[in-house]
Design a protein with these regions (language model features):
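Outer-membrane beta-barrel translocator domains and adjoining extracellular loop/strand segments
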Residues: 58-64, 96, 100-104, 129-132, ...
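Outer-membrane beta-barrel "beta-signal"
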Residues: 192-203, 347-349, 356, 371-384
């Protein structure tokens, strides 16, 4: 990891030395490097972004306050095409943690059909599909942290068509290994994902269906209704593509997501529902029982249950935004995980859209059988 970081830092250093006197036509937020071949046989865009964060936590149990300042994310990403605009690619590297996030090729082989191959995000809940650069609050919700499909390696088939003048339909199907990021071991079984997206009033402006906040101030109502079904065969990890590795007998996991995303004239709303269950057998893999055969402690289990996340914001004319979120997590009772409810209120100041902004939020977390907790976060986003 250290060698990789050294190589990246050295490359950027020499790039800055060699080109420090050049004048570029690139505006801020449009990438550090934008190059296209003279014969148009390839094109690339390279960008760098980072987030710095302050986080403070107040525990009502003992009235203690703990805080820290840290780098939340730092990433280098590249995209473009090779040979033909129909063969695109995306690459993203996590400089902060030292591993590859995305390495995917996208081939538009005919009409409205495109196949993706490599490692990238699966088409799960809408909040996860948003880039972490383009969030409305400081970070994603508890629904995402407990139920997300995250990233995986495999193949995706994507298609879209339009009814009449405006009604857009998008379909996404994927087969992946099921264990998540950067796995080197053999897969225990495959993961199958299907998603459908319905946009009855047509496309959002500038792909606004895939970023939070109505920065484009939609002049007419835009709406996306979506559903995702995921089947993870012989899931090796407690939350499918994420979580701890299961040591006992493996089960299949079945996950359902329903979401809606709406924007109009500075107002934005999205809601998500998630449900995960084991398809064969109990979610509990190993437990301690009393003499009556009732579970008194769970030693190992899959994280199953349901969650609801609702989020809304309003963008003022001066590019300040206020936003609020309610998230409820209800794990399956047999796993003995606690119900959680979280309330979040936040603000954003968009200087250059999602490329340069300051965000802050405050959250109250209520967890069954525990004292409440309060969290305050302040974050900056800087994206070339």
């Amino acid at each position: 990891m250290k060698k990789s970081l050294f190589l990246i830092i050295t490359t950027i250093f020499f790039f800055n030395i060699n080109f420090s006197q050049d004048v570029t036509n690139n505006s801020f937020g449009k990438g550090l490097i934008n190059v296209i071949a003279k014969d148009s046989s390839w094109k690339t865009k390279v960008a760098f972004r980072f987030q710095t964060r302050y986080e403070g936590n107040f525990d009502f149990r003992d009235s203690s306050y703990k805080d820290r300042a840290f780098v939340r994310r730092a990433r280098i990403k590249g995209s473009g095409y090779a040979f033909s605009p129909k063969i695109k690619y995306k690459f993203e590297y996590d400089v902060h943690n030292g591993f590859v996030l995305d390495a995917v090729i996208k081939w538009n082989f005919t009409g409205n059909w495109t196949v993706w191959f490599g490692q990238t995000k699966l088409s799960g809940n809408i909040d996860r599909v948003f880039s972490s650069q383009k969030l409305q609050l400081v970070d994603r919700s508890l629904l995402n942290s407990k139920f997300t499909l995250d990233r995986d390696a495999g193949a995706q088939l994507r298609h879209h068509f339009t009814f009449g003048e405006n009604f857009l339909v998008r379909e996404i199907f994927s087969i992946s290994q099921g264990e998540g990021l950067n796995q080197t071991v053999s897969s225990s079984g495959s993961d199958y994902t299907g998603r459908i997206e319905l946009l009855p009033f047509g496309s959002f402006t500038k792909k606004g269906d895939y970023f939070a906040a109505d920065l484009k101030r939609e002049k007419t109502v835009k709406l996306m209704l979506s559903a995702t079904y995921d089947y993870n065969e012989n899931a090796m990890r407690s939350r499918g593509q994420k979580g701890s590795y299961i040591n006992g007998d493996l089960s299949d996991l079945e996950t359902l997501f329903l979401d809606a995303h709406l924007k109009y004239n500075g107002i934005s709303f999205f809601g998500e529902y998630a449900n995960r269950k084991t398809k064969n057998g109990s979610a509990v893999v190993d437990a301690t029982y009393d003499i009556a055969g009732d579970i008194i402690a769970v030693n190992e289990s899959y994280y199953t249950g349901s969650s609801l996340n609702l989020q809304m914001g309003y963008l003022l004319k001066n590019n300040w935004e206020i936003a609020a979120r309610l998230t409820q997590v209800n794990p399956e009772r047999i796993t003995l995980n606690n119900d959680i409810k979280q309330y979040t209120l936040g603000f954003s100041r968009y200087v250059v859209g999602h490329n340069l902004k300051v965000q802050g939020d405050i959250s109250l977390t209520e967890e069954a059988s525990k004292k409440n907790k309060m969290m305050f976060r302040l974050q900056t986003e800087f994206n070339f």
